[in-house]
Amino acid sequence: MSAKQKPVNTPLHLLQQLSGSLLEHLEEACSQALADAEKLLAKLEKQRGKAQEKLHNGRLKLQDAAKAGKAKAQTKAQKAIGELEELLDSLKERQTQTRSYIQQLKRDAQDSLKLAQGVGKVREAAAKALDQRAAKTSKPAAAK
């Protein structure tokens, strides 16, 4: 046999490892979901800004066409303005939904992490039990 024996993984070891990795993965998943939602919100805000700029330019074109008396250009500009206004309404609604989702996600993450504190206590209890066992096995060895 080799001088260094590989420690045997017991159910206590497994419980400690699993509870630790569960907490780690939960925290990571909560953070990632929040980051993804905030990226989406930023993307929507950027799209909305571009659409507002296009709408402003479209209204300027409409004014120019009206001043020049170009009916065809006016119709085209009005159609483009209508489409841009619909797009802006849609983006505004999606932003509102995303903000709501982010709020709910934050609450869910908080609740999940609060509930997971019990798992942390399980990990600590398993570690304590392993430490106590190690202390018991080292005392007889020291007495010899």
What annotation goes with each model-predicted range?
Residues 50-75:
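Extended alpha-helical coiled-coil "stalk/arm" regions
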Residues 81-103:
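Amphipathic alpha-helical coiled-coil segments
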Residues 29-49:
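Short, charge/polar-rich alpha-helical segments
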Residues 97-134:
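Short, Lys/Arg-rich amphipathic alpha-helical interaction segments
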Residues 9-36:
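Short, charge-rich amphipathic alpha-helices with coiled-coil/heptad character
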Residues 42, 49, 56, 82-85, ...:
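Generic structural signal for well-ordered, non-transmembrane alpha-helical segments
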Residues 131-144:
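Long low-complexity, Ser/Thr/Pro- and charged-rich intrinsically disordered regions
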